[in-house]
Amino acid sequence: MAVEHVEWARVAWVDTDAGGRIHFTAAFRWAEMAEVGLRRKLGLIEGWGDYPRRRVEAEFLKVLRFEDEIEVRIRPERLGETSITWTFEITRDDEVCVRGALVVVRVDVDGVPAPLTKKERAALAG
């Protein structure tokens, strides 16, 4: 899939642990920030629906610290019937520091998995 999106951020104090390194949860917040940015860019914010996380994973390759400037790149890797697998990379100075994936499942108001919409599928497939 050719669709991807990039967001830029700076590691905030709140993103760090007592040792001054990023807390592991920060990577998932930044990935979600990029996910929302991509949805916004593709016109998929209105009527977005509910997408709980089914699986999250991250590999931390380099240390990120307070005030580091980062780039967060996300792309849909796989579109299932009811799910999207996002892959993301977080870089500093063109060096990959974190890479990971999120599997999200579209659910209806009762929390039951629901098919992706045709609009979503077309936009995310590129």
Language-model-derived ranges and their functions:
Residues M1-R55, D108-G126:
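Hot-dog-fold acyl-thioester-processing enzymes
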Residues V3-E7, F60, L64-F66, E77-G126:
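HotDog/MaoC-like acyl-thioester-processing domains
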